[in-house]
């Protein structure tokens, strides 16, 4: 499939984070929200915990789930890097023009820069895709609970906007799906990628309320739609898909219902919502991604329905053989959402 050019999209993930060398990102200090480079003490993140001691002028990140228990990172950086070209090709370009128009007409924007909050930024692929497609000076605030991912996102961030204007970044450590309008004070835009489907209905509602309260638009891309097409079709496709979708809904998470819930939540807060499909279209040139996706997709289905194990093992072997032979094509459906919240002072 055709890949649009993305700034630094092919940046390699370092084996270990090195010294921070990013414009606009201050070095870690004792009690800060980033552990010092090379440090393992305190490197694990407690979900729901904000920075131990924010630097002057910084707001603490807001809690997502105050479980009091330590969880492993949600995504491996290698997986995030592997999927980045497919994500870049899939995101909807049709939502960019209405977004640009809204950003140009934000109250106080004339001649000013953009402040973009990227929620659950991972390795920063959203910024690498979007920043070079927007004009004007930009300051990106990257939120994630994993300090390693935050470091990589910062050092691999784009340095210039579409018109050559400067792009700077800062990082905020924490699991931040629940935001408040105060946490978004001064924000021009909130972005997220592949986030909505791992949130609950309450968390999506809180995100919509925060964006509406701050009067900033939200571009939320690549939420799973619950539909997969494989060529050639197989009798087990439907059962695997249904079991995977049920797995996605575990623990009250929205999974494939996320976009509908988010659209309803933003609409209730007076936002204009636009949806566009953003499917992955995977062919022989995407064999590495297809293989990893297949293993995870079938594995989750079997975890949800163990009685599928024997048939699913044969199914996976057959699909992997077709993938290795360059004969498998997959469409994984996603949806992008643009919510144009009303500016807080009643502007355009």
Task: Mark where each language-model region is.
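Conserved catalytic/acceptor-binding region of the Class I
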Residues: 216-278
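Class I SAM-dependent methyltransferase Rossmann-like catalytic core
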Residues: 2-19, 36-38, 42-108
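Short conserved loop adjoining the S-adenosyl-L-methionine
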Residues: 178-184
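A short, conserved alpha-helix within the catalytic core of class I
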Residues: 198-211
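Class I SAM-dependent methyltransferase SAM/SAH-binding core
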Residues: 117, 124-178
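Conserved Class I S-adenosyl-L-methionine
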Residues: 184, 267, 272-348
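Short catalytic micro-motifs in class I SAM-dependent methyltransferases
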Residues: 194-195
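A conserved beta-strand element that flanks and buttresses the S-adenosyl-L-methionine
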Residues: 191
């Amino acid at each position: 499939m055709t890949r649009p050019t993305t700034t630094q999209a092919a940046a390699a993930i370092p084996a270990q984070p090195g010294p921070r060398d990013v414009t606009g990102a201050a070095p870690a200090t004792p009690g800060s929200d980033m552990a010092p480079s090379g440090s393992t003490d305190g490197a694990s993140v407690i979900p729901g915990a904000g920075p131990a001691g924010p630097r002057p002028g910084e707001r603490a990140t807001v809690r997502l789930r105050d479980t009091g228990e330590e969880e492993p990172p949600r995504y491996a950086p290698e997986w995030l890097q592997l999927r980045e070209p497919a994500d870049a090709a899939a995101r909807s370009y049709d939502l960019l023009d209405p977004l640009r128009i809204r950003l140009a007409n934000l109250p106080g924007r004339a001649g000013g820069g953009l402040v973009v909050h990227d929620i659950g930024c991972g390795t920063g692929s959203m910024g690498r895709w979007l920043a070079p497609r927007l004009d004007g000076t930009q300051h990106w605030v990257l939120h994630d609970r994993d300090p390693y991912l935050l470091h990589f996102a910062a050092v691999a961030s784009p340095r210039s906007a579409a018109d050559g204007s400067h792009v700077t970044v800062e990082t905020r450590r924490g699991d931040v799906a629940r935001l408040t309008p105060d946490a978004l004070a001064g924000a021009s835009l909130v972005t997220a990628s592949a986030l909505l489907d791992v949130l609950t209905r309450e968390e999506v509602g809180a995100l919509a309320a925060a964006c509406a309260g701050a009067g900033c638009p939200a571009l939320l891309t690549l939420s799973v739609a619950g539909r997969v097409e494989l060529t050639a079709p197989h009798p087990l496709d439907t059962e695997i898909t249904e079991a995977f979708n049920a797995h996605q809904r575990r623990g009250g998470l929205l999974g494939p219902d996320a976009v509908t819930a988010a659209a309803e939540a933003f609409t209730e807060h007076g936002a204009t919502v636009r949806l566009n499909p953003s499917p992955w279209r995977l062919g022989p040139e995407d064999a590495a991604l297809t293989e990893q996706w297949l293993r995870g997709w079938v594995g989750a289905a079997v975890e949800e329905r163990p009685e599928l194990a024997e048939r699913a093992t044969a199914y996976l072997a057959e699909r992997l053989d077709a993938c290795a032979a360059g004969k498998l094509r997959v469409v994984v459906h996603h949806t992008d959402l643009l919510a144009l919240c009303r500016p807080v002072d009643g502007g355009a």
